[in-house]
Amino acid sequence: MRNQIPAAGKPRKFFRFFLGGCIALAVLLTGAHFAWKASGTGEWKLVMQKEGVNIYERKQPGDTLKTYRAETRIKSTLARAVGAMMDRTVEACAEWNAGCVSGQEVEPWNEHERYYIHYFRMNSPAPMAPREFLLRAQFTPDADDKSVFIQYTAMPDKLPLNDCCHRVTRMNNSWKFTPLGDGELDVEFYQDLDAGIPYFVYNLAAPGFVYDGLALLPKLVNKEKYDHERISFLAATH
């Protein structure tokens, strides 16, 4: 008679194979994670050219998230572009980010130092928690080339944490608008962001999101209401 594995032993044997496979997969994924984190040249690489928008990405050794840089030109004025960046209404936020649902002034516009700090809350697709952004926006005009550089930096500790939401702790994004004449602006955008999603998802999706933002930029900034913005530091440097 053939030796047969008792029925009770078959599940145990399957479990051993399953457990061994899980351990091997965990080791493989851990190795891949650390290999990815250690990789990178720190050099910018062109990853997308579309309808006048150039998008570059950079992978730094020691970081799992890529950073992004984009360049384009738009028909607009410096006053409109800067006015749009100073618009802190929830309505304006929702035009830039469809999930934006609320906002709060943390520090009002500082005319002398040219900055403000504002809070925005954005809904996220289920099952992710809403995202909270506490941002300092710093405006720096350049008297030589008439450009304006705007730096957005996360300030996560400016308000107490909310249990409802994920507070974004890493954001170092910037815009630079340089007048070219004939009603054109040169636009440079930089994104360094951790939105609290898996890095492999973010790195895959980010170029498309950056492009969408640049493609929508003329519509977002070319609003009549921004023609009436009184921006004193523009008058002082132009």
Question: Which sequence ranges carry the predicted segments?
Answer:
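Eukaryotic helix-grip
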Residues: 2-238
